[in-house]
Amino acid sequence: MNLDALMAIFTGFDVAAFLPELDTLIGWVEMVLRILVMAGPLLMLGFGLLYLLAPPKEANYSVGWRFWWSMASLDAWQFTHRWTGYVWSGLGLLLTLIMAFVCNAFRRMDPMQMVWAAVKSLGWELGLMGIACIAINVAVIIVFDKDGYRRKDYAEYEEE
């Protein structure tokens, strides 16, 4: 990988553009839009890391990924939280990086362009989060039956 090509990516990236001018109304609008756009990916990244590093120990009705198949057995519960951690932390990191570039571009936009860019970003975040949640549920349904037992094709240990 060429270092010049990598540096060209960050040519228009201005760290100072992350600080809105709070002495104007547009500056406050810009700050609120940045918080709205960055909150989803950062929460997804945080919960993904939480599910990877410190998942709930057993199935319960208060904390964790509550889904019929995931709560059927301890194995299904652990599988679900491990994969939720992988998917959410990866998607959260990717969206955090992308939305940082979107938020950086807010300074150069007109107010209505800024609002519509934030609305489009929130739509993409919501859509990708929904797809990720559905994919996790489908993966659990494929690997486990409704009683929480691994299907034959996905057994971890073969009995000899």
Model-derived features: positions:
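Long, highly hydrophobic alpha-helical transmembrane signal-anchor segments
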Residues: 2-39, 111-126
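Hydrophobic alpha-helical transmembrane segments
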Residues: 27-42, 61-76, 117
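Hydrophobic core of alpha-helical transmembrane segments in multi-pass integral membrane proteins
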Residues: 38-49, 95-100, 125-139
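Short membrane-interface loop/juxtamembrane segments of multi-pass integral membrane proteins
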Residues: 66-83, 156-160
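Select subsegments of transmembrane alpha-helices in polytopic membrane proteins
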Residues: 81-95
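Short, intrinsically disordered, charge-rich cytosolic tails of integral membrane proteins
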Residues: 146-160
